[in-house]
Amino acid sequence: MVTLAELLVLLAALLATASGYFVSIDAHAEECFFERVTSGTKMGLIFEVAEGGFLDIDVEITGPDNKGIYKGDRESSGKYTFAAHMDGTYKFCFSNRMSTMTPKIVMFTIDIGEAPKGQDMETEAHQNKLEEMINELAVAMTAVKHEQEYMEVRERIHRAINDNTNSRVVLWSFFEALVLVAMTLGQIYYLKRFFEVRRVV
């Protein structure tokens, strides 16, 4: 019989396979991250550009044989899942080479699934329904975590847009007030001079 402590340790181990990061990528720079996996392992990349420029980044996933698995240009966010076609180190790169001066902040998560099991272990796993339920729960919790991180980044982006719009509206209002005061003073001065009585000596 599996104890509650063993279940919690198994759940924590399953959740530990997904790591979320924030990375700053300078203009004309590229940042790469590497994961070593066995053939058949399911992998996934979820990313979102949080700050910088037009919120776009170039993304590339390369296999151990330097074969391109995925390439995206000027993407703001994305999700890509694939199965490793061979044993080795897979490379996940974010490139900001198209930007002339703006650094980008990218939030990303690389999900690494479980390595495929042998035939004997697979039948044993089917017999253990509790382990399957824990795996499903771990996947669901990871999905909720990713969605929460995504919403947090979107909220930060929208707050920055709102703050920027608010500051522009306030500055424009001050400018309009100054123009209104200047026009009022000009009209008072003009009317005052218009009604002045000029004396001829």
Curated annotation (Swiss-Prot):
Required for TMED10 and TMED2 cis-Golgi network localization as annotated region, ranges: 118-157
Region (Interaction with F2RL1): 1-181
Entry superkingdom: Eukaryota
Annotated SUPFAM superfamilies: Supernatant protein factor (SPF), C-terminal domain
Main location: membrane
Domain (GOLD) ranges: 30-112
Membrane spanning stretches: 169-189
Coiled coil: 117-167
Keyword terms: Coiled coil, Cytoplasmic vesicle, Endoplasmic reticulum, ER-Golgi transport, Golgi apparatus, Membrane, Protein transport, Signal, Transmembrane, Transmembrane helix, Transport
Cytoplasmic side stretches: 190-201
Protein family according to the UniProt entry: Belongs to the EMP24/GP25L family.
Gene that encodes the chain: Tmed2
Subcellular localization: Cytoplasmic vesicle membrane; Cytoplasmic vesicle, COPI-coated vesicle membrane; Golgi apparatus, cis-Golgi network membrane; Golgi apparatus, Golgi stack membrane
Protein name: Transmembrane emp24 domain-containing protein 2
